[in-house]
Amino acid sequence: MQEIQKLQIAYPDGHIDVDDYLNQIDQQSHYTVFGIIDAALKGDSIKVNKIFNSLVDDATPPVILISSLYREIKALIVMSIELKQNQQIDSILNNHRVWQKRKPLITNALKVHSYQQLQKLLLTLGRIDRSLKGMDNLNVYDELRSILITLSGKIQWIR
């Protein structure tokens, strides 16, 4: 009911077209850490940036994103090792209890990233965590965005 009231306030004359409606709905969307990780695994860097900006604006604590990314990248590393051991991808996904909906995302990530690339992302994530705790000097938000964009398969400038 609140969404209808918001639309009435935004469009007092009562006329709204499909594009305006979709734009309004998009602005009202609440993004989650899981959504940004799925967007990265899917390879959608534009959506990753959009969700990231929304999470920062909503003051989502970086530690939540760090822990979720750590868990996801760690699982990808283990699956990558199993893939190198010539196990079938379907078998690996089933053994790790990957939901049917996420299987294409995980499969895509395993095709795009090597074991070494995933390991490097995990090491960078560790530095980000240390920076958050004051033991390193990285810009936490810039580095988190960088990891997510890299996870989405986009090549970034080398520092």
Predicted regions and their residues:
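Short, charge-rich, low-complexity alpha-helical interaction segments
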Residues: M1-H15
